[in-house]
């Protein structure tokens, strides 16, 4: 099953298109482009990272990010009303950390390493330009 995963941000968002075995596409793009991307890919399950503060104070940037996540969700659901297909799921980062690292305290580097390990280590997972691995080209927020 192919899934569109979105890590929303206040101005730009990371996205990964994953088919269960390899990354089919990825990028970090301005939010207005991500909104269009969500509308076009509405027929896929869309998984959006759920924002959580865990009791910490949050600022304007976090609220902007939450608004954009809701806009992405709305874009998919509007298309679903028209076509009858499409689904949106929110996934808290904490759940990802627990699943991949068995610890809610895992850091970004731990999550990245767990993903590399799952695909045979860094060399096999990333590959190279001539022989790309299933995670070839991922960077920054695309790992999360």
Language-model region placement:
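Phosphate- and other anionic-substrate recognition elements at nucleic-acid/protein interfaces
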Residues: 1-144
